[in-house]
């Protein structure tokens, strides 16, 4: 059933119909379309288009249709309807006859689809917020179990300073907290109802759009009908949120892929999230993490595609805007799947503490401590930095750690160095001294875990 046709004297070419139809993907908006239609039927009563009895008959039929859709959403795809709006209207007419043809009075598919999509987006934001918080909780639990698991921290993929596995986990908690905040901000701008704006100039019926917005669970109604039917900022924002969130997940995946290598050997992933090789029987591949890392491209691509779709569109609605859904659906599905998978990766991960400790003790990661020691003795930092660089060269020549150099060797580079330097160079001292907020000391880690647990409770 097409919702238009009187203007045309020839049927649409079947090839055009296949090109034009959107039911194959916008069927996912069926529930929202039905819910919006129920609210619209109530609004039509207030302007005397429908009687209360007619509205009740329509609502009863729409509620029955909603139950059918929830039981078997795939049934929709068997139809040759143009889009989800025509499918719902056709089914409604099947149930109530000519009365179903009155429902679209004063409404356009332009404000209808905008409403459907916003309702769907609101539901998705709620689900993504839950998934984001669940992953944060998994990270916090992993951090709590590994507060004293010392490992090297890296810059330029070179060992830099000692940190703990807990500190690494908490770094991603912070990233995910920002993702959560972005979603909450997006929801504020998303939470306005388009319904009642018509095709572009508003509805000709004196409907209370604020009341209508409340029936649909929106905070308020939009202020300008022309902007409303043209607006897809919420799609761009959600795609941007997803893109940033996926970048964070990709970095998480890349770190663990490296930690899991034989060369690093810091962690071992559970069999539940790894796979083998068809040829090499010894292989245990981090496929879950590699797929998370690999799926960033499709999400970033959806954001770019939507930006390009919108950039040259005149007001108001254009058919180009039909391209808003497939990329959005896929991107948000992908982000949610990857959040759940990232949490699963942490379930059963083994941190190899002895190997982490060994790696942290290598690479002269305590060099900054020696520089700070010299500064405390009155040596200007830039000079201390140079002295420590020379000392590291000497240690490399001897093939020993800094703390293994004899005092006489250390004093070749600065006479202020004394026996009291050796406790300063211990790994534990390196950690304990980082006790300012956000640092890697056990006290700061414990406090950060407590604060994160309270926030996520």
Curated annotation (Swiss-Prot):
It comes from the Bacteria. GO terms for molecular function: argininosuccinate lyase activity. Pathway: Amino-acid biosynthesis; L-arginine biosynthesis; L-arginine from L-ornithine and carbamoyl phosphate: step 3/3. The keyword Lyase applies. It is an enzyme of class 4 (lyase). This is Argininosuccinate lyase. GO terms for biological process: arginine biosynthetic process via ornithine; L-arginine biosynthetic process. It catalyses: 2-(N(omega)-L-arginino)succinate = fumarate + L-arginine.
